[in-house]
Swiss-Prot record:
A matching Pfam family: EF-G_D2
Start and end residues of each tr-type G domain: 11-280
Protein name, UniProt field: Peptide chain release factor 3
Purpose of the protein: Increases the formation of ribosomal termination complexes and stimulates activities of RF-1 and RF-2. It binds guanine nucleotides and has strong preference for UGA stop codons. It may interact directly with the ribosome. The stimulation of RF-1 and RF-2 is significantly reduced by GTP and GDP, but not by GMP.
Bridged cysteine pairs (disulfide): none
GO CC, any one term: cytosol
GO terms of molecular function: GTP binding; GTPase activity; guanosine tetraphosphate binding; translation release factor activity, codon nonspecific; translation release factor activity, codon specific
Primary location recorded for the protein, binned into one broad class: cytoplasm
PROSITE patterns in UniProt: G_TR_1, G_TR_2
Primary gene name: prfC
Keywords: Cytoplasm, GTP-binding, Nucleotide-binding, Protein biosynthesis
Sequence similarity: Belongs to the TRAFAC class translation factor GTPase superfamily. Classic translation factor GTPase family. PrfC subfamily.
Recorded coiled-coil stretches: none
Length: 529
């Protein structure tokens, strides 16, 4: 049976994001992946803040200055017979809810681990989010051109800390100055590493077979013997790769390499296009939507301001779930019930825009947004349904925001509400006073908000510390009990940017006590958009 042209396009798509702790090498790996996809000819390395070769995926002004990727950008490139969509996620010490939300728009994730450090804090947090949907995970152990921890130990740590089984696909031969390459367990081939070839795709020398005397000549007798010993151990002690278990998020194929030296990235990409799922079905409030359906549907998972410094526009990023987008098609924005003609959707190559003529399930397209689109919005060809699973996450950090010029209160509120619709930050207005409290998942979000208020809304503001430890969205089925709760806790209650009632707790102890005192009230950590 031959697939229809539409289904062939769907089957070609692979949509993934990279998750890692800051400085594990995510931006470098993004560069190298794009290089293999022929999207950029010479990969611009991130380091050297003053250098003019900026990495392609970091494009907002603040990112250019700091050398970090604040905003989730989207890049599409061909690889083998597939079209790969890579969603870049902010990886810096400081990231935001956007990072969490981006993970709801992909079918698979690549986890990048610094092999000298192992599993780190941010990686744990992001893995928790992927668990909400049992997303399949591939793993890349990076930085083999440095001295690393014992590879077996690294696998044990991933298994114990992240509760996912590891199936090594490649195995390293030496590390640091002695790094010689990797052996592929399933192809029975050794790929030899050459230094100094990081900016281009290098011709790799391949030695077939583990017992081939060429291997001993190439890496030295000692390392060759060590490799054979380690592989005996690995084959006995580790898991075999199983695609079904990979698709259900229970096992991760592990690749070793160095993104900086551009070695091993292609092995990982080969695994990605071969094993990662084509666009997956999505749950709505009424039914499951399959990618094979001909009618268009999609949801907005992030809104981005100022991709074009010359224009104050905002772009809503939409994941296509089913059907084909064609230029000029009419779509219904389900939340408002309005039909809109989309004639100028964008595709991305990180900050370079090109207008898109068509897009298929798994693709990400950008819609121009003048304040009418919100995160979580569903677009269809008329069907009234809402995709679920694009949450707001309870902030972990809070500041009170004050104006330098009290006459600009209106602009400040407008700016904050727009930034909160975009998911840049969350805003809370306490019921008992006129304060404005800003909540974020990472500290850098506060700086981003401050600089954007200044450049986009001409508002100069300052932050003050505020006695808030955490926030929870509250609801209750019993109206009478809810009224009593609201009356007695007015001082702790606030409305968020979307006018949802929120309990703002000064301490975790206070939150726990309040939850015990009001068992009928639900306190939520995430809220569907």
């Amino acid at each position: 049976m031959t697939l229809s042209p539409y289904l062939q396009e769907v089957a070609k798509r692979r949509t993934f994001a990279i998750i890692s702790h800051p400085d594990a090498g995510k931006t470098t790996i993004t560069e190298k992946v794009l290089l293999f996809g022929q999207a950029i000819q010479v990969a611009g390395t991130v380091k050297g803040r003053g250098s003019s070769q900026h990495a392609k995926s970091d494009w907002m002004e603040m990112e250019k200055q700091r050398g970090i990727s604040i905003t989730t950008s989207v890049m599409q490139f061909p690889y083998h017979d597939c079209l790969v969509n890579l969603l870049d996620t902010p990886g810096h010490e400081d990231f935001s809810e956007d990072t969490y939300r981006t993970l709801t728009a992909v079918d698979c994730c690549l986890m990048v681990i610094d092999a000298a450090k192992g599993v780190e804090d941010r990686t744990r947090k992001l893995m928790e989010v992927t668990r909400l949907r049992d997303t399949p995970i591939l793993t890349f152990m990076n930085k083999l051109d440095r001295d690393i921890r014992d590879p077996m130990e690294l696998l044990d740590e991933v298994e114990n800390e992240l509760k996912i089984a590891c199936a090594p696909i490649t195995w390293p031969i030496g590390c640091g100055k002695l790094f010689k390459g990797v052996y592929h367990l399933y192809n029975d081939e050794t790929y030899l590493y050459q230094t100094g070839q990081g900016h281009t795709i290098q011709e790799v020398r391949i030695v077939k077979g583990l017992d081939n005397p060429e291997l001993d000549q190439a890496v030295g007798d000692e390392l060759a013997a060590q490799l054979r010993d380690e592989l005996e151990l690995v084959k006995g002690a580790s898991h075999e790769f199983d695609r079904e278990l990979f698709l259900s998020g229970e096992i991760t194929p592990v690749f070793f390499g160095t993104a900086l030296g551009n070695f091993g990235v292609d092995h990982m990409l080969d695994g990605l296009v071969e094993w990662a799922p084509a666009p997956m079905p999505r749950q709505t409030d009424g039914r499951v939507v399959e990618a094979s359906e001909e009618k268009f549907s999609g949801f907005v998972f992030k809104i981005q301001a100022n991709m074009d410094p010359k224009h104050r526009d905002r772009v809503a990023f939409m994941r296509v779930v089913s059907g084909k987008y064609e230029k000029g098609m009419k779509l219904r924005q389900v939340r408002t019930g309005k039909d809109v003609v989309i004639s100028d959707a964008l595709t991305f190559m990180a900050g370079d825009r090109s207008h898109v003529e068509e897009a298929y399930p798994g693709d990400i397209i950008g819609l121009h947004n003048h304040g009418t689109i919100q995160i979580g919005d569903t677009f269809t060809q008329g069907e009234s349904m809402k995709f679920t699973g694009v949450p707001n996450f309870a902030p972990e950090l809070f500041r009170r925001i004050r104006l330098k010029d009290p006459l600009k209160q209106k602009q400040l509120l407008k700016g904050l509400v727009q930034l909160s619709e975009e998911g840049a930050v969350q805003v809370f207005r306490p019921l008992s006073n006129n304060d404005l409290i800003v909540g974020a998942v990472g500290v850098l979000q506060f700086d981003v908000v401050m600089s954007r208020l200044k450049s986009e809304y001409s508002v100069e503001a300052i932050y003050e510390s505020v006695n808030v430890a955490t926030a929870r969205w509250v609801e209750c089925d019993d109206a009478k009990k809810f009224e009593e709760f609201k009356r007695k806790n007015e001082v702790q209650l606030a409305l968020d940017g979307g006018d949802n009632l929120t309990y703002i707790a000064p301490t975790m102890v206070n939150l726990n006590l309040t939850q015990e005192r009001y068992p009928d009230v639900t306190f939520r950590k995430t809220r569907e958009h």
